[in-house]
Amino acid sequence: MMSNDIFPNKFKAALAAQRIQIGCWSALANPISTEVLGLAGFDWLVLDGEHAPNDISTFIPQLMALKGSASAPVVRVPTNEPVIIKRLLDIGFYNFLIPFVETEEEAVRAVASTRYPPEGIRGVSVSHRANMFGTVPDYFAQSNKNITILVQIESQQGVDNVDAIAATEGVDGIFVGPSDLAAALGHLGNASHPEVQKTIQHIFARAKAHGKPCGILAPVEADARRYLEWGATFVAVGSDLGVFRSATQKLADAFKK
């Protein structure tokens, strides 16, 4: 029997303690690039299932690639749907980023999808990758309290309901989706617009008022540092796709121009 090194969830504990967590977005859907990210020293990595070409078959090798990494894998699910979340739990994810949460009811649904009864509605399989195929004896006793739920606020309705969402039991943090939020506020492609920035600051303040850490994606260093000053706890400061695109263009330009 293998030793159980999956509990407690250190990322969840770090968020609860309001310790700064610096992360990176993983969008290339490739185990090699994900493994490289896992060697860099980030506290957490988002494996994107909403906008990146990921599915169960691509997530599993990426989780394997991060097995020895100190970086906590966080999966952004394609949608807030219990069956999708159940399958991602079963393959070994413990940290979830739920996109486009607009109401308290949607936040409650997200939490319930990750919990076994009676606390939730997660379906039960006795042998899967997450419990090392039945070799973790305390898995069912430990699972519910070791799942991290981060919900994204990225619409006007979400902003309007941020207090109720942040107060939802089982929600571990509030994450701002700056691009969709900008679009919702009428500033598509311009997350730096003053109205968007003011709204981000408001979301951070409301999350803090409920004792919940807040996070954001900020690939521009000046933005990331400003959000940290505003009280953000978990910030993704770049993406593998962005770094790769920028570095390859810079290399080509050095010789072609």
From Swiss-Prot:
Annotated positions binding Mg(2+): 154, 180
Highest taxon above the source species: Bacteria
A GO cellular component entry from the record: cytoplasm
Gene Ontology biological process terms from the UniProt entry: D-glucarate catabolic process; galactarate catabolic process
Pfam family, one: HpcH_HpaI
Molecular functions (GO terms): 2-dehydro-3-deoxyglucarate aldolase activity; magnesium ion binding
Complex formation: Homohexamer; trimer of dimers.
HAMAP family listed in its UniProt record: KDGluc_aldolase (MF_01291)
Described function: Catalyzes the reversible retro-aldol cleavage of both 5-keto-4-deoxy-D-glucarate and 2-keto-3-deoxy-D-glucarate to pyruvate and tartronic semialdehyde.
Protein name per UniProt: 5-keto-4-deoxy-D-glucarate aldolase
Source organism of this protein record: Citrobacter koseri (strain ATCC BAA-895 / CDC 4225-83 / SGSC4696)
